[in-house]
Amino acid sequence: MARIAGVNIPVHKHTVIGLTSIYGIGKTRAQQICQTCNVDPTVKIKDLSEEQVESLRTEVAKFTVEGDLRREVSMDIKRLMDLGCFRGRRHRRSLPVRGQRTKTNARTRKGPRKPIKA
């Protein structure tokens, strides 16, 4: 298994698809990384040479991925909650943040229905 950014990349997948298993790298960024490293995106990870894997590692290291990105996102949400702005209050109450309706929808965000006790 190739290990890039602290993640074991599945060896039986194509390079582009394998890179997307890293948190913070989507399909477009994976294609850009392959193009920068001169790696064919359709080659499977197990067929890459050690130099190619090392070049992928150095290229991925230029981006904020995995734990650093997760920490950054959670700190951004925490900052919004500390400010007490509208978005922060919505996060704190576990309600939709981006203006969606909540009268009939938003069950995923609100959780299971709570019956009214008489």
Swiss-Prot record:
It holds the Pfam family Ribosomal_S13. GO terms for molecular function: rRNA binding; structural constituent of ribosome; tRNA binding. The keyword Ubl conjugation does not apply. Residues 91-118 are annotated as: Disordered. Gene3D superfamilies: 1.10.8.50, 30s ribosomal protein s13, domain 2. One of its GO terms (cellular component) is small ribosomal subunit. One of its GO terms (biological process) is translation. SUPFAM superfamilies: S13-like H2TH domain. Belongs to the universal ribosomal protein uS13 family. Part of the 30S ribosomal subunit. Forms a loose heterodimer with protein S19. Forms two bridges to the 50S subunit in the 70S ribosome. Located at the top of the head of the 30S subunit, it contacts several helices of the 16S rRNA. In the 70S ribosome it contacts the 23S rRNA (bridge B1a) and protein L5 of the 50S subunit (bridge B1b), connecting the 2 subunits; these bridges are implicated in subunit movement. Contacts the tRNAs in the A and P-sites. This is Small ribosomal subunit protein uS13. It comes from Francisella tularensis subsp. holarctica (strain LVS). The lineage of its organism: Bacteria, Pseudomonadati, Pseudomonadota, Gammaproteobacteria, Thiotrichales.
